């Protein structure tokens, strides 16, 4: 099992699949029961239209689910196709509830 200290994760870069920096980690969302990391809380550029459609906290940081993230030695890489699917599913659910 690979281990890493929290302070080495905070401020780590988040890049897209082409290696372009899209933001940085500012916090984590952890399941209290299992201890699993559920999402990264990230500070991103306002120009990141796709990522800005994800859930945000009161400071404008976004929650990126771990299901769309690959971890490399020095950064977190997001899969924008998976993010689009999450956003599409959320829109579909909202329409059905209306």
What are these regions (language model features)?
Residues 1-98:
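Peripheral interaction segments used for macromolecular assembly
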């Amino acid at each position: 099992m690979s281990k890493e200290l929290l302070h080495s994760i905070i401020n780590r870069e988040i890049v897209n699949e082409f290696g372009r920096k899209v933001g940085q980690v500012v916090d984590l969302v952890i399941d209290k029961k299992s201890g699993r990391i559920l999402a990264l809380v990230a500070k991103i550029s306002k120009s990141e239209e796709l990522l800005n459609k994800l859930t945000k906290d009161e400071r404008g940081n976004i929650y990126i689910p771990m299901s769309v993230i690959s971890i490399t030695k020095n950064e977190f890489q997001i899969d924008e196709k998976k993010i689009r699917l999450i956003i599409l599913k959320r829109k579909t659910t909202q329409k059905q509830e209306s």
